[in-house]
From Swiss-Prot:
Primary localization: plastid
Name of the protein: Ribulose bisphosphate carboxylase/oxygenase activase 1, chloroplastic
Family annotation (InterPro entries): ATPase_AAA_core, P-loop_NTPase, RCA-like, RuBisCO_activase_AAA_helical
Similarity section: Belongs to the RuBisCO activase family.
Keyword field contains Ribonucleoprotein: no
The entry's keywords: ATP-binding, Chloroplast, Nucleotide-binding, Plastid, Transit peptide
Function noted in UniProt: Activation of RuBisCO (ribulose-1,5-bisphosphate carboxylase/oxygenase; EC 4.1.1.39) involves the ATP-dependent carboxylation of the epsilon-amino group of lysine leading to a carbamate structure.
Gene Ontology terms, MF aspect: ATP binding; ATP hydrolysis activity; identical protein binding; ribulose-1,5-bisphosphate carboxylase/oxygenase activator activity
Amino acid sequence: MATSVSTIGAVNKTPLSLNNSVAGTSVPSTAFFGKTLKKVYGKGVSSPKVTNKSLRIVAEQIDVDPKKQTDSDRWKGLVQDFSDDQQDITRGKGMVDSLFQAPTGTGTHHAVLQSYEYVSQGLRQYNLDNKLDGFYIAPAFMDKLVVHITKNFLKLPNIKVPLILGIWGGKGQGKSFQCELVFRKMGINPIMMSAGELESGNAGEPAKLIRQRYREAAEIIRKGNMCCLFINDLDAGAGRMGGTTQYTVNNQMVNATLMNIADNPTNVQLPGMYNKQENARVPIIVTGNDFSTLYAPLIRDGRMEKFYWAPTREDRIGVCTGIFRTDNVPAEDVVKIVDNFPGQSIDFFGALRARVYDDEVRKWVSGTGIEKIGDKLLNSFDGPPTFEQPKMTIEKLLEYGNMLVQEQENVKRVQLADKYLKEAALGDANADAINNGSFFAS
């Protein structure tokens, strides 16, 4: 054992020399691999044999071929700027006094994703046919929307273009759907907001959200893709519907924020930071039923261009043709249906089409049994049932249409809330059910 230990110690103490017989006269193989490495010897060396001069191994420099650089290269971000608000805010953390930063945990100083992975929660992407086969876009509607969006992307001399386009009109007239059709036609993926996001339990949160969504749209535009901010039912979230609605701080700040963005569309800042670099101008499209409920300075002509949408008979026929396009309903029958219900909104005809499937669903329920509906719909290996398209005749459509109209009349005629306050009886609806066996007036 002792002999082994001493032998090992002697071996370990032997230094490695390139000049003696231990190392030999050949050059040791390098640990580097690749064809781009070459061995550089001292000056005056004529043979590969190693001399007393030091050995240097360097890598040969190769010119980078730009043609090999692809968009899918994972290292492309090292030489190109992929900056966005998420990263910019994070860089400012610790560099700005906490007095001017949002409270911890509000999400304004946390980078959630890398910029090339980041997709806004409000981004609406359309995967449908851009040719819009079977769908009808009203010419007046499309003209107004396309001209407004285009004007906001142009630099017109000495002209102040309103940033906001307010589309308002009656309920169920297809304002939002027509906007989405135009966006698809133009190849725009809008940043979406709704009235429910314009109120919060935290003061100032909706106003901050508007700024965030606006800058997200500006970032998309900066990268070469058309975008806009689309707010549905603005009057429902920021308007006053009479004395029964409370005017909150958030209502006030939403109106003020939209006014400020309309006045300074290229200088929209987020809470807790200030970036001197201007953002892209983003056109804002808002819909609503009554803009008189909004703050008057917001809807003045310099800030908001207003468009009242009231579809004509030709528009209604065109939209309804698109609604019944897969049901093989003749064009003349569509015209009869539209003319039979002149006072109804466009979504009435969509509800009418859905009512026709009631008979098919009723047949399936009677054949399956009420007790087994849950198992068949949710726990079946075969999946939920599929139905063939029922045949839609003009007689059946008119019958269901009249039923929908009677339901509407009942709501206006009965008015149970007033009856509850005035008397103990249930009103006309109860009398109709007792006398006629139906809730509909005879």
